[in-house]
Curated annotation (Swiss-Prot):
Keywords: Hydrolase. GO terms for molecular function: guanosine-5'-triphosphate,3'-diphosphate diphosphatase activity. Its EC number is 3.6.1.40. Belongs to the GppA/Ppx family. GppA subfamily. InterPro entries: ATPase_NBD, GppA/Ppx_hydrolase, Guo-5TP_3DP_PyrP, Ppx_GppA_C, Ppx_GppA_N, PyroPPase_GppA_Ppx. Coiled coil: none annotated. It comes from Pseudoalteromonas atlantica (strain T6c / ATCC BAA-1087). Pathway: Purine metabolism; ppGpp biosynthesis; ppGpp from GTP: step 2/2. The lineage of its organism: Bacteria, Pseudomonadati, Pseudomonadota, Gammaproteobacteria, Alteromonadales. It comes from the Bacteria. It catalyses: guanosine 3'-diphosphate 5'-triphosphate + H2O = guanosine 3',5'-bis(diphosphate) + phosphate + H(+). This is Guanosine-5'-triphosphate,3'-diphosphate pyrophosphatase. One of its GO terms (biological process) is guanosine tetraphosphate biosynthetic process.
Length: 503
């Protein structure tokens, strides 16, 4: 059975804040820790484009300084009610590079009434990795990439420990000024930007490609913008190099930044999108990245969780699951019952076919534990209500693609199967998602009595789309309710072109 994992409770409620003075945007995040869980209660993001104010002599101009100070004046009021020891304020690449950084930091500290730390590139990379590790799925070795305004961090790590990290002086703002200064989007400009980025990445690539990483995660910024574009264009998938090439061509077809209109591209990112895209293409090519998923956190989340050291010892996925189970009053015994049956089926399935690649077992566990979320609203359409809810609540410990997979499983765990949801999956993952749906549907049917110790030993035999579920002789006849439900399930799967035999 799945056991409960909860965070230790420090105080009834505490507020924490992290301020990240990035080269493109300034960020403020405020969280509260209550009953052992971390809840975001405030986020502020302002485009400051501090790096755009750097001249050839590495001096920040007055306009960029003023933009930064005005932004901090809005942040200062939000920080007044938070204990000083619970606040961290850091600045990154631009203030590392600027020769007159002290002009900015002295006044910034006066405005915030708090110490501002200009952290090194290595420390920034470490904090980014921690933010990603706390909020995203753990699948062994992970390659983490963050493209900022003036620097790009590359980190390889395992679980909560960064193994090797580097910070490169290239970012979407500085590359925009350097390679797209005339706002022209040409093949030549893209080639120059990609070549420049590859020259920097190639110098350190050997230290990363030697690691056998299980997943590549992109932290915010350009990867997030690309994911939003893919979703808007009907693609529910990880970021892949062929998608990046296609987006590069879409940019070139627009000719100039003024004319850059891509379905799904937020206006606030339009100016720096091509330069960030060029850097990401270079990273994919130099590091031989197959695909990239979006992480749930980055630098500011690393700062927050760094102040909550006790969280390092806890399973973030199970914490997420149990928080939602409590909030939506899910029957924990039935959830564990369905999960146990689902895992039994999954184990037999995995012995006969390839279900690796997207951490399907973790998605199956989450969906099985949370499949009755929608009962919080009503019974008839609870599978649809549950899928909607899980698409809009925090799923700490899971990537965005895994959250989408959990939604798909919950949506299809009963009644008719929605074939269109699989069309958005990449061909490599589509078959796995179909198999997981079939497993969860069978687990729900076999647990329909909501009682323990009713099921006998059973065997799942799999040959492509033909599944055979074998019970002891006479068992189905002695259990007409489950027999009838399985008969209906045969028909539902038949409509999908899947063959199910139960005997």
């Amino acid at each position: 059975m799945i056991t409960s994992t909860r965070l230790p409770q420090n105080h009834p409620e505490e507020l924490y804040a992290a301020v990240d003075l990035g080269s493109n945007s300034f960020h403020l995040v405020i969280v509260r820790v209550v009953a052992g869980s971390v809840q975001i209660i405030g986020k502020v993001k302002q485009k400051v484009r501090l790096a755009a104010g750097l001249d050839d002599n590495m001096m920040l101009d007055n306009e960029s300084l003023e933009r930064g100070w005005r932004c901090l004046e809005t942040f200062a009021e939000r920080l007044q009610d938070i204990p000083r020891d619970n606040i961290r304020v850091v600045a990154t690449a631009t203030l590392r590079l600027a020769k007159n950084a002290d002009v900015f930091t002295v006044k910034a500290q006066q405005i915030l009434d708090h110490t501002l730390s200009v952290i090194s590139g290595e420390e920034e990379a470490r904090q980014i990795y921690l933010g990603v590790a706390y909020t995203s799925a753990n699948q062994g070795n992970s390659l983490v990439i963050d493209i900022g305004g003036a620097s790009t961090e590359i980190i390889i790590g395992n679980d909560m420990t960064p193994i090797h990290l580097v910070s490169l002086n290239m970012g979407c703002v500085t590359f925009k000024e350097r390679h797209f200064a005339g706002d022209v989007l040409s093949e030549e400009n893209f080639a120059a930007a990609i070549d420049a980025a590859k020259a920097m990445v190639d110098a350190v690539a050997d230290k990363f490609v030697c690691f056998d990483w299980q997943q590549c995660l992109g932290a915010s910024g350009t990867p997030q913008a690309i994911t939003e574009i893919l979703v808007a264009q009907g693609i529910s998938d990880a970021i892949r190099l062929d998608y990046l090439y296609n987006l590069r061509q879409q940019c070139i077809d627009c000719s100039t930044l003024d004319n850059l209109i891509i379905d799904g591209l937020d206006e606030s990112r339009r100016i720096i999108f091509p330069s960030g895209l060029a850097i990401l293409i270079a990273l994919f090519e130099s590091l031989s990245i197959r695909d990239m998923q979006i992480s749930g956190g980055a630098l500011r989340e690393g700062l927050i969780y760094g102040m909550l050291e006790n969280m390092q010892q806890n399973d973030r996925r199970m914490q997420t699951i149990h928080q939602h189970m409590q909030h939506f009053h899910i029957d924990s015994e039935q959830a564990e019952r369905v999960t146990e049956v689902a895992l039994t089926l999954f184990k037999q399935l995995s012995e006969q076919t390839d279900v690796d690649g997207i951490d399907g077992e973790a998605m199956l566990v989450a969906a099985a534990m949370l499949h009755e979320t929608g009962l919080h609203i009503e019974y008839k359409l609870h599978h649809k209500h549950g899928a909607y809810i899980l698409g809009h609540v925090p799923m700490v410990g899971y990537t965005n693609l895994q959250r989408d997979g959990i939604k798909t499983l919950v949506l299809n765990h009963r009644q008719q199967i929605s074939p269109e949801v699989f069309d958005q999956n990449h061909s490599e993952t589509r078959g796995i998602m179909r198999s997981l749906v079939r497993v969860l549907r069978l687990a729900c049917i076999l647990s329909i009595r909501r009682k323990d110790n009713l099921l006998p030993q059973f065997c799942l035999e799999v040959e492509e789309n033909d599944w055979r579920l074998v019970f002891p002789e006479g068992w189905l006849k002695a259990h007409p309710l489950i027999d009838a439900e399985l008969a209906n399930e045969k028909w539902q799967q038949h409509k999908m072109g899947w063959h199910l035999t139960c005997e």
